[in-house]
Structure formats: structure tokens, C-alpha cells
Regions:
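A short acidic, often aromatic-flanked loop/helix-cap motif at beta-alpha or helix-coil junctions
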Residues: 49-53, 104-106, 187-189
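Conserved alpha/beta core of the MobA/IspD/sugar-nucleotide pyrophosphorylase nucleotidyltransferase superfamily
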Residues: 134-214
Length: 214
């Protein structure tokens, strides 16, 4: 969490909105202290029912932001170049731009938890989801979003979808407005279980010298 906030600020974010749910009071107290300590403007947005799909968190956060924004999964860590490049990816044909990694067999990717991405010839998204059998890349968990993303999630819910972020992404993909940015050789990690937590402790200081001061 703190790493992601510091990275977003270094990528140029003027304000960081953190969506809270489980143990919200404890997290919000930590965020207030971090804001004082770091000088970063941090605003919590609480989702009352944290059991709902993650698209509801996107809508809650987007409601507090005017215009485009970097969207990051709280348990992901990114090399600085990923977010800095992603912040520059906007364009009139894009409702969202997703950072993707074509190294789908990397030891840093958890195949049991990954969200897979199938691409069109122009690099825009054709399909996205955890259950894809044919895919070209893995979703890195970092997006440059426009207001269209939250609108797409809301529209998907109206049409009967559960309300996941991928529901909204697929809707934008179907409209030809879900772009991608290939991260190339850059480093990132989804810290969702103990072995990846150990990898993060081992590798993050090497890849994030601006945070760890090495």
C-alpha cells in the first residue's frame, strides 16, 4: 500500500485516492499518518460492502477524481518506468490503457491468479479475464483510466454483470477503446501470497532504488 502511494506520487499524481473496505478505520488512520509524514495528498474512499467485486472500488475512487487517473492494484509493485510511461499514454481513441506483460511464463506471474489479455492486431484488447484459454499477455494491474472506465463498469452491472473491473474492461474492449502498453523488460510483481511476498522483499530494493535509497 505505502509503496504504491509513493510510486503514484513519483509518477506525477497530484492526489492519491485509496479505496478502503476491510478494516477501513485502521487503514484510514494509517493513511492520514502517511499523508502527514510524506506530504502526499491522500484521500480515502470507503466501500461499505467490501465483499462486492472490485469494479465497485473503481467506481468509488473515480467518483472522487475529475478527469483521467492512474489506477493501481494495491497489492502490486511496479518499477518506476512503468507508471511514468503509462501516465503519458492518453489519447482520444482510448477509454483506458492497460499495462501488459508478454512474458506470460515468467516466474513473477502467478498463473492461478493472473488476469489474461488477448490482443487485436493493433494492440488493443480483444478479450480480458482470468479464464481465457488463448491469450497474448498478462494484465499488470496498472491502468491509465478515463471516466469511461467507471461508466463501462456501471453499464455492465446494469446489463447483469457482477461488476468486476474486467467486466468494464471487456465492455470498453468490445467498443474498441481498451488500449495497452507493453512494459517490455520492466519489473513488476503481484504480491498475493507468501512466496511472492518473499520475492518482493528480495527484489524490490534492486528495482525501486528511488524508494529504497539503494
Amino acid at each position: 500500500g505505502e509503496l504504491g502511494i509513493r510510486q503514484a506520487a513519483r509518477a506525477g499524481a497530484g492526489k492519491v485516492v485509496v479505496v478502503t473496505g476491510h478494516e477501513a478505520e485502521r487503514l484510514e488512520a494509517f493513511l492520514a499518518e502517511l499523508a502527514r509524514r510524506s506530504g502526499i495528498a491522500i484521500e480515502p474512499a470507503r466501500v461499505a460492502d467490501w465483499s462486492v467485486p472490485n469494479g465497485y472500488s473503481v467506481m468509488a475512487g473515480a467518483a472522487r477524481i475529475a478527469g483521467d487517473y492512474l489506477l493501481m492494484m494495491a497489492d502490486h509493485i511496479f518499477e518506476a518506468s512503468i507508471l511514468q510511461r503509462l501516465a503519458q499514454q492518453g489519447g482520444p481513441t482510448r477509454g483506458v490503457t492497460l499495462a501488459i506483460d508478454r512474458r506470460v511464463t515468467s516466474e513473477l506471474v502467478d498463473p492461478d491468479d493472473a488476469t489474461w489479455v488477448a490482443l487485436r492486431e493493433d494492440g488493443f484488447i480483444r478479450a480480458i479475464g482470468k479464464g481465457l484459454e488463448a491469450y497474448d499477455a498478462v494484465d499488470c494491474g496498472a491502468f491509465l483510466a478515463t471516466p469511461q472506465l467507471a461508466e463501462a463498469i456501471e453499464a455492465a452491472i446494469r446489463d447483469g454483470a457482477p461488476g468486476s473491473l474486467s467486466n468494464g474492461m471487456q465492455r470498453l474492449a468490445d467498443a474498441g477503446r481498451a488500449a495497452t502498453m507493453d512494459i517490455g523488460e520492466a519489473w513488476w510483481l503481484d504480491v498475493d501470497e507468501p512466496r511472492f511476498h518473499a520475492m518482493a522483499e528480495d527484489q524490490a530494493p534492486l528495482h525501486l532504488p528511488e524508494i529504497f535509497g539503494s
